[in-house]
UniProtKB/Swiss-Prot annotation:
Keywords: Aminoacyl-tRNA synthetase, ATP-binding, Cytoplasm, Ligase, Metal-binding, Nucleotide-binding, Protein biosynthesis, RNA-binding, tRNA-binding, Zinc. This is Threonine--tRNA ligase. One of its GO terms (biological process) is threonyl-tRNA aminoacylation. Residues 261-567 are annotated as: Catalytic. It comes from Mycobacterium sp. (strain KMS). CDD domains: ThrRS_anticodon (cd00860), ThrRS_core (cd00771).
Length: 684
């Protein structure tokens, strides 16, 4: 989830045949090493990035790529990964190299070493890296004449040897790709002798001095190529930026992100947990978390009813044939839990008397919704038919990628499937996108852009013509929204292209949230039909959509967005009464009863803690409204407000206090209440 902005694209420059891209950059007077916007590579018209040492055979127009752009940072981080690998092999000569790609906001490199890296190791490696950067080693591209030459050179690097034969197109495998097998050598800038090298397709910065700021952040175990049947390696993570200022901002952001980590807040606020007895990626929600979750669902349910959705419910398991028909077993089996073979009957000798059947936990709700549609004849007058379900699904995620609530194995989706005529398709998509954006805004998420995921040429069903029509329709609807639209080539599910809403949180991080998929294929596979106005039988168009993605993921994102301080309408405890002394508890109980009668969630703190301690405790629990009462308040029939920002309003008549609280909640304000805001709302 990248948070840094990219500059506007630079104007193109011309590189003359037989000269380097770097020379053209210098001749154009563009920024060089040391500037945050230093040009680090250039981009050809087809999007390919080239080193500044690249020499074209013919005159060519290229776009300079600065260090403070997304691509520029990616190149710097990839080069920093090489510097890390060199440092590791200098300090740990027995280390074997895995892969080392740039990733969002950083990079990593995997190593096969005898033991795990320690914090002291990372300090030593960082020191070694600083020396390599200071030396200004040159990055030089070298083309292997043959695979045999590469294998001879890499004979002592078993993981690199495996990559020589790699044809997967994995974007994290920076070692190979394109039509050439290449290495990047690090050269002594004075003697040009080779100091170190790595199998790599590039591109890279000109010298190590183009890495102005970096830091190693942590290490962990990681399976080779993410496959738990492979060797367990040690992965070192780091980050690199175009300036020390940018790095410092990023590290501050990391610190704040750690403070907001929903896994940490889930424990501190008693919202949810992940019991070992249940297994990885299977959360349980505690009573307070259950309240937040219910509020999320109830509001969504009400909005869907207003929008004309019809609620359905489907089971958690199904016979195998359903996912044969849908294509999931052919295209999505790796994401499904293993089959359960049940209903077999055996005789006394153990021989099968009646064969059983395979059942699966459902990874998606859509096939079951299609059965509901198909359960009787449908008329064009019924369309669009919008079926909605809070449906539980189960997906096999590798243990290494399971992460809190945002990547789980058991989840509940706010899943809808809309069956429409082709003539209704565009208007339905347009209104659906607006419905999604409005509902996200109601939860306080109102900064977003759109991403258009198109077909994976190796993993799709249906004709190219159908895919082209679906993709173009989604593109037109997305562009008409006025939001930024970013391409995601090959990112679609096997049955149709999709628009995803990428939401920006309070820290500026982007999260994939809602998805809208247009599908012409499933109606064919399930033989879905409706009777048209002319009496003919027609196929409906299918729209898949999930607004939250999953309830669990949305819960996790909101927890971090609000740092656990949920808006009052979502908060598990909306008001807490804090007496100055025990004698004031009955009075606060009366106020609490008044609030409860209006649907407000209230607690009274009658513990033995001192009042100051109680205020600290409930501030830490992110309770939006704290009501204090002492002798003067009781005598005046009033209460005093205390807020999380330490502001306070004293002596508010209790009826006014109740109305202020109820009004704040009913209006679903997503800002935290403060003394000034409550006074303004009450007109005082």
């Amino acid at each position: 989830m990248s948070t840094a902005a990219s500059p506007a694209p630079a104007a193109p420059i011309r590189v003359a045949a037989g000269t380097t891209a770097g020379a053209a950059v210098r001749d154009a007077g563009l920024p060089g090493r040391g500037a945050p916007d230093a040009i680090v590579v250039v981009r050809e018209a087809d999007g390919r990035l080239r080193d500044l040492s690249w020499t074209p055979d013919a005159d060519v127009e290229v776009v300079p790529v600065p260090a403070d752009s997304e691509d520029g940072r990616s190149v710097i981080r990839h080069s920093a990964a090489h510097v890390l690998a060199q440092a590791v092999q200098d300090l740990f000569p027995e280390a074997k190299l895995g892969i080392g790609p740039p990733i969002t906001d950083g990079f990593y490199y995997d190593f096969d070493v005898p033991r795990a890296f320690t914090p002291e190791d990372l300090e030593a490696l960082e020191k070694k890296m600083r020396k390599i950067v200071k030396d200004g080693q040159l990055f030089e591209r070298r083309v292997y004449e043959s695979e045999e030459e590469a294998r001879r050179e890499l004979a002592n690097e078993p993981y690199k040897l495996e990559l020589v034969d790699d044809k997967s197109g994995d974007p994290e495998v920076m070692e190979v790709g394109g039509d050439e097998l290449t290495a990047y050598d690090n050269l002594n800038p004075r003697t040009r002798e080779r100091v170190w090298g790595d199998l790599c397709r590039g591109p890279h910065i000109p010298t190590t001095k183009y890495i102005p700021a970096f830091k190693l952040t942590r290490s962990s175990a990681a399976y080779w190529r993410g496959d738990q049947t492979n060797a367990s390696l040690q992965r070192i993570y780091g980050t690199a930026w175009e300036s020390q200022e940018a790095l410092d901002r990023h590290l501050e952001l990391i610190e704040e992100a750690q403070r907001r980590d929903h896994r940490k807040l889930g424990v501190e606020l008693d919202l949810f947990s992940f019991p070992d007895e249940l297994g990885s990626g299977l959360p349980v929600f505690h009573p307070k978390g259950g309240i937040v979750r219910k509020e999320l669902e109830d509001y969504s349910r009400a909005k869907h009813l207003q929008a004309g959705y019809e609620f359905v419910n489907t089971p958690h398991i199904t016979k195998e044939q359903l996912y044969v028909t849908s294509g999931h077993l052919e295209w999505y089996a790796d994401g499904m839990f293993p089959a359960m073979h049940i209903d077999a009957e055996y005789d006394a000798d153990g021989a099968v008397r009646k064969p059983g059947q395979n059942y699966y936990l459902k990874p998606m709700n859509c096939p079951m919704h299609h059965l509901i549609y198909r359960s009787r004849g449908r008329s064009y007058r019924e369309l669009p038919l919008r079926l909605f379900e809070f449906g539980s699904v189960y997906r096999y995620e590798k243990s290494g990628v399971v992460h809190g609530l945002t990547r789980v194995r058991g989840m509940t989706q706010d899943d809808a499937h809309i069956y429409a005529t082709r003539e209704q398709m565009r208007d339905e998509l347009t209104s659906l996108l607006q419905f999604v954006l409005d509902l996200l805004s109601d939860y306080g998420l109102d900064e977003y852009y759109l991403e258009l995921s198109t077909k994976d040429p190796d993993k799709y069903v249906g004709s190219d013509e159908i895919w082209d029509e679906a993709t173009e329709t989604l593109r037109e609807v997305a562009e008409a929204s006025g939001l930024d639209l970013v391409p995601d080539p090959g990112g679609a599910a096997f049955y149709g292209p999709k628009i995803s809403v990428q939401v920006k949180d309070a820290l500026g991080r982007n999260w994939q949230m809602s998805t809208i998929q247009l599908d012409f294929n499933m109606p064919e596979r399930f033989e879905l039909e409706y009777t048209a106005a002319d009496g003919s039988r027609q196929r409906p168009v299918l729209i898949h959509r999930a607004l939250f993605g999953s309830i669990e993921r949305f819960f996790g994102v909101l927890t971090e967005h609000y740092a656990g301080a949920f808006p009052a309408w979502l908060a598990p405890v909306q008001v807490v009464g804090i007496p100055v002394a025990d004698a004031h508890i009955p009075y606060l109980e009366d106020v609490a009863a008044q609030l409860r009668s209006r649907g407000v969630r209230v607690e009274i703190d009658g513990s033995d803690d001192r009042m100051a301690k109680k205020i600290v405790n409930h501030t830490n629990q992110r309770v939006p409204f704290m009501l204090l009462a002492g002798d003067k308040d009781v005598a005046a029939g009033a209460v005093s407000f205390r807020f999380g920002d330490r502001t306070q309003i004293n002596g508010v008549p209790r009826d006014e206090a109740v109305e202020a609280i109820v009004g704040w909640i009913v209006e679903r304000r997503n800002t935290a209440p403060t003394a000034d805001l409550v006074k303004a709302g009450a007109g005082t």
